Amino acid sequence: MKNLNELSATSFGKGSKLQLIEQKTCIVVGIANSRTRLRIGVLLSELSEYQVDYISSESETGKLIEEADLIIGAGITAYEGVLRRKPVIVVGDYGFGGLVTPDTFRKHYNNRFRGRINGAKEESFSLENLEREICKGFNLTFQELQMMSNQTITLQNI
């Protein structure tokens, strides 16, 4: 995972000129519900330190998830994110499910990554909750992400 606002040096052309390019941490949003997607967009617009990409078609899902540092989504987007060892925050038709962790993975999986367990349709959530979960997501270890990916594969094969 990239560090927040990591700077990289790149050489262009024949000269020895070096240009610093700021690479923002990439968050990919894959939410089918238009109201929820709009709400997430409004909240993320307050957090300028992230590059935010939205999945708009199935054909680009794999590429965007692979390039992402963190996924916000529901259903197949969240499922794919876990499989690819990405931090995933579940936000779906049933509200704000929060960060998928080793402790919450099985509940989210059984709920098909649709939102908060026992959540209500289109329930509201705050920028503070989203921001807190984003920070927690970037603190997940590779081992934790790998473990959840392996569990997904195991459950898929049952």
Regions found by a protein language model. Give the residues of each.
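A short, well-ordered alpha-helix in the C-terminal region of glycosyltransferases
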Residues: K136-Q156
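A short acidic, amphipathic alpha-helical/loop segment
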Residues: R39-L43, K63-L64, E80, R84-K86
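Conserved catalytic-core segment of nucleotide-activated headgroup transferases in glycan assembly
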Residues: M1-E58
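Conserved active-site histidine-acidic residue motif and adjacent donor-binding/catalytic loop
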Residues: A32, D53-L64, I76-A78, Y94
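Metal-dependent phosphohydrolase cores
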Residues: M1, K86, T152
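Catalytic binding pocket for nucleotide-activated donors in carbohydrate/polymer assembly enzymes
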Residues: T77-F142
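An anion/phosphate-binding loop that grips the pyrophosphate of nucleotide cofactors and donors
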Residues: A68
